[in-house]
Swiss-Prot record:
Pfam families: NQRA_2nd, NQRA_N, NQRA_SLBB. It catalyses: a ubiquinone + n Na(+)(in) + NADH + H(+) = a ubiquinol + n Na(+)(out) + NAD(+). Disulfide bonds: none annotated. This is Na(+)-translocating NADH-quinone reductase subunit A. One of its GO terms (molecular function) is oxidoreductase activity, acting on NAD(P)H, quinone or similar compound as acceptor. Keywords: Ion transport, NAD, Sodium, Sodium transport, Translocase, Transport, Ubiquinone. Its EC number is 7.2.1.1. It comes from Neisseria meningitidis serogroup C / serotype 2a (strain ATCC 700532 / DSM 15464 / FAM18). InterPro entries: NqrA, NQRA_2nd, NqrA_C_domain, NQRA_N.
Length: 447
């Protein structure tokens, strides 16, 4: 087992009950274009078109052959675009159960599949988009070969679902998905799970299981990659989430695209935090209807540390998100708040009484408690960064855009989520995720 000591389990109130309930009926789903780094869509549908589940909606011009398929049948209700015509979302009004059928295989045939057959079925169904590269966190090219594939079967994000609960309901599909991935490449398939977690595996020669323990970010793919198979400019691995492995197993067993999702609905503003069944790209406001405390709330698709605000054209469950988090907007000002002992406020430093209340869960809000200021290196980054890098120096280079030094310090190993804790504990109120993305784009473009 690999156990990390540095990190932070955020003591946030509203942790979900680890029992799966049926979610509300969903009448709108969408694909969010801005989730896919560097993607430029070539649209295959227009507003008003009827689509089947699994039908191609658009293709990536910059990554030919990579297609994005409909998570449900219905009609294209809207195609939202932002500045410079950036695709924000393709919205489908759900109607009927029409769907496209893909290749299916008998259980005993899965172990004999060729890599070409696996690749073709994943690409045609749109499940190829479940894979992401590291470095750069982009969808791999259809003819690319990874050095390894990392299956993330654990989640240490605040308010997250326990993967063991989700996988237990679909253990056979998870095993089939692992077997299919083992046929996609001859390289290693690293299945990463929490210490002692009951996660099934397969006996394929290239599948290895690893256990991780410790605080967040022990459950992030970036942490797993760093300790097992570090990447670089000339070494690429792929990552995939456990729920997508289940979807792959069902696709190859039934020939039908499975877009079901189990999401954790949690946070201090949720009346009954719990796990809910829904669908990929579901309208978040429909999931949360009647579930929230009547207040000025911020609804987030994903983790409170690294999720996206779910509203307007983005009011949909993200492709790579397995949770919906709800906290209160922090709009009120507090007069001389820094003078008070503040037992109801949490800080990683010893500046509030709440820091010393080890078993207390706090009602966090969106306030950053201060304005923008210079970066202040007082050791907070090192306390939450378990990777063997120099976080203060790396973060400084991200701020100034020094791509050469950032690359030398290990930025190619990282994704936005890997720096979310650094943003949370930053006295200077910097958001390091967008800064990292900007540097990665420059490195990819200029070398």
């Amino acid at each position: 087992m690999i156990k990390i000591k540095k990190g932070l389990n955020l003591p946030i109130a509203g942790r979900p009950e680890q029992v799966i309930y049926d979610g509300p009926a969903i009448t709108e789903v969408a694909l969010l274009g801005e989730e896919y780094a560097g993607m430029r869509p070539s649209m295959k549908v227009k507003e008003g078109d009827a689509v089947k589940k699994g039908q191609v909606l658009f293709e990536d011009k910059k990554n030919p052959g990579v297609v994005f398929t409909a998570p449900a049948s219905g009609k294209i209700a809207a195609i939202h675009r932002g500045e410079k015509r950036v695709l924000q979302s393709v919205v489908i009004a759900v109607e009927g159960n029409d769907e496209i059928e893909f290749d299916r295989y008998a259980p005993d045939a899965l172990a004999k599949l060729s890599g070409k057959e696996v690749r073709r079925n994943l690409i045609q169904s749109g499940l190829w988009t479940a894979l992401r590269t590291r470095p750069f966190s982009k969808i791999p090219a259809v003819d690319a070969e990874p050095f390894a594939i990392f299956v993330n079967a654990m989640d240490t994000n605040p308010l997250a679902a326990d993967p063991v609960v989700v996988i237990k309901e679909a253990a056979e599909d998870f095993r089939r998905g692992l077997l299919v991935l083992s046929r996609l490449t001859e390289r290693k398939i690293h299945v990463c799970k929490a210490a002692g977690a009951d996660v099934p595996s397969e006996n394929a020669a290239n599948i290895e299981t690893h256990e991780f323990g410790g605080p967040h970010p022990a459950g992030l793919s970036g942490t797993h990659i760093h300790f097992i198979e570090p990447v670089g400019a000339n070494k690429t691995v792929w990552t995939i989430n456990y729920q997508d492995v289940i979807a792959i197993g069902r696709l190859f067993a039934t020939g039908r695209l499975n877009t079901g999702r189990v999401v954790a609905l949690g946070g201090s503003q949720v009346n009954k935090p719990r796990l809910l069944r829904t669908v990929l790209g579901a309208k978040v406001s429909q999931i949360t209807a009647g579930e929230l405390v009547d207040a000025d709330n911020r609804v987030i698709s994903g983790s409170v540390l690294n999720g996206a605000i779910a509203q307007g054209a983005h009011d949909y469950l993200g492709r790579y998100h397995n949770q919906i988090s709800v906290i209160e907007e922090g709009r009120s000002k507090e007069l001389l708040g820094w003078v008070a002992p503040q037992p109801d406020k949490y800080s990683i430093t010893r500046t509030t009484l709440g820091h010393f209340l080890k078993n207390k869960l706090f009602k966090f809000n969106t306030a950053v408690n201060g304005g923008d200021r210079a970066m202040v290196p007082i050791g907070t980054y090192e306390r939450v960064m378990p990777l063997d890098i120099l976080p203060t120096l790396l973060l400084r280079d991200l701020i100034v855009g020094d791509t050469d030094s950032a690359q030398a310090l290990g930025c190619l190993e990282l994704d936005e989520e890997d720096l979310a804790l650094c943003s949370f504990v930053c006295p200077g109120k910097y958001e390091y995720g967008p800064l990292l993305r900007k540097v990665l784009e420059t490195i990819e473009k200029e070398g």
